[in-house]
Amino acid sequence: MSSKTALLLLQMGGPDSLDAVHPFLMKLFTDRDIIKIGPAFLQPFIARRIVNKRAPKVEEYYRQIGGKSPIRELTEAQGEGLQQLLGEDFRSFVAMRYSRPSTIDALAAIKRAGIERVIALSLYPHYSRATTGSSVNELKRVLNESGAKFEISYIDRFYNHPLYIKALSEKVVQGLAAFPDSKDVEIVFSAHSLPQSFIEEGDPYLDHIQETVRLVMEQVGEGSHTLCFQSKASRVKWLEPSTEATIEQMAKAGKKNLLMVPLSFVSDHIETLYEIDIQYGEEAKALGIERFIRTESLNSSPLFLECLADLVKTAAK
């Protein structure tokens, strides 16, 4: 057996073509860790009706950003960057929750490599049962069904890690520098939304998001900022205020310069490339916002990779 440690990166995934949008959405809407639609035995039927209606619209979103999600390539690049930082004792693998390579694919590859020790690193900084929880549950389910024996440890959050905060703060400072006068900029932190019921049931996601914002603004220094939530996916009550409503409120208040800071996203994908850059960008322009700029995503930025490497080193001890 190999003495290497497998570094398993857990990520949501995304369609790798327009034809993959429908199956991707079906996997998403049938995952009861992320959304419960009626009784369990009816969820696949209800999900199919929802997805059949939504898929054409979502396909158009992906068409506008190149016809697919870049999340696989970006996650694999993060894994390669981590391998370079961590050395030859580690080998990276990727497990996407709703696309390929799947958790089954990743564990099979680890087994073929003869590796017995696995560090599962969730690429969601802020813990939620809908994201990290779902990915970890899927990993445990696959392990149980396959009977595979691995020594596994989990990294399930890093919302307050000093290097993560430093990496985010660096992006905010760079974004502010793109404006003629940084003092006249509203910093808008936009996090992925979550059903309000999750928070009421004890999910720590909102607390983690708020703490990240507080720590980033501590480093950035003075500046007007607000927190909002994007990507609502059902009719139940979700976290508020929404990003759309926040942009509208800023415009009504006479704000002309918005710096959008994506939170809970460590890589570019549809929420940044389409939702913020295109959808919200067009809305902001129509409302009279003169400068609408998004901070660069972390992707494989050196500070972010250092953060992940530090998390892995700690877990490997």
Swiss-Prot record:
Listed name of the protein: Ferrochelatase
GO biological process: heme biosynthetic process
Major localisation: cytoplasm
HAMAP family, per database record: Ferrochelatase
Reaction it catalyzes: heme b + 2 H(+) = protoporphyrin IX + Fe(2+)
Family per similarity comment: Belongs to the ferrochelatase family.
Keyword match Iron: yes
GO CC list: cytoplasm
UniProt entry tagged with the keyword Iron: yes
PROSITE patterns per UniProt: FERROCHELATASE
Single annotated GO MF: ferrochelatase activity
Enzyme class: lyase
Pfam families linked: Ferrochelatase (PF00762)
InterPro entries: Ferrochelatase (IPR001015), Ferrochelatase_AS (IPR019772), Ferrochelatase_C (IPR033644), Ferrochelatase_N (IPR033659)
Pathway: Porphyrin-containing compound metabolism; protoheme biosynthesis; protoheme from protoporphyrin-IX: step 1/1
SUPFAM superfamilies reported in the protein's UniProt record: Chelatase
UniProt keyword annotations, A-Z: Cytoplasm, Heme biosynthesis, Iron, Lyase, Metal-binding, Porphyrin biosynthesis
Compartmental location: Cytoplasm
EC number: 4.98.1.1
Residues annotated as binding Fe cation: 192, 271
Role according to the record: Catalyzes the ferrous insertion into protoporphyrin IX.
